[in-house]
């Protein structure tokens, strides 16, 4: 699956493991897990394949965040993303990563 990043800091975190913007500082364990989950998402052919990993807790969000999906980083953080299906088939899914959010805020 193809991954694009909506925010620059998300791409910086993935590429270099840190960000230049001090507003988005995370613990090293969170960053390592974030990179691991993004790599796992890239390896999968589509978002449906994420359901076989129970620890990710893949779900489509409801309410104010309807239209987004999420996977868990740990109990506190999740990656929120938009799914874009190209063509009639779900062959190529482009995930647009929108946020690394603190789940309970």
Which role does the model predict for each range below?
Residues 1-3, 11, 48, 56-59, ...:
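Flexible, active-site-adjacent loop/turn segments at secondary-structure boundaries
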Residues 2, 50-53, 89-92:
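Short, surface-exposed helix-loop/turn micro-motifs enriched in polar/charged residues
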Residues 6, 30, 34-37, 57, ...:
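Amphipathic alpha-helical interface surfaces
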Residues 41:
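Conserved phosphate-interacting/catalytic interface
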Residues 45-69:
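A short, surface-exposed loop/turn module that caps and links secondary-structure elements
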Residues 68-105:
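Enriched for short, Lys/Arg-rich terminal
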């Amino acid at each position: 699956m193809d991954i694009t990043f909506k925010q620059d800091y998300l791409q910086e975190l993935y590429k270099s493991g840190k960000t230049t913007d001090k507003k988005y500082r995370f613990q090293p364990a969170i960053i390592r897990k974030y990179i691991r989950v993004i790599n796992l998402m890239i390896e999968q052919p589509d978002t449906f394949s994420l359901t076989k990993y129970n620890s990710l807790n893949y779900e489509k969000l409801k309410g104010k965040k309807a239209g987004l999906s999420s996977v868990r980083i740990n109990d506190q953080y999740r990656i929120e993303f938009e799914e874009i299906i190209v063509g009639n088939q779900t062959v190529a899914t482009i995930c647009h990563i929108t946020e690394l959010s603190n789940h309970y805020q």
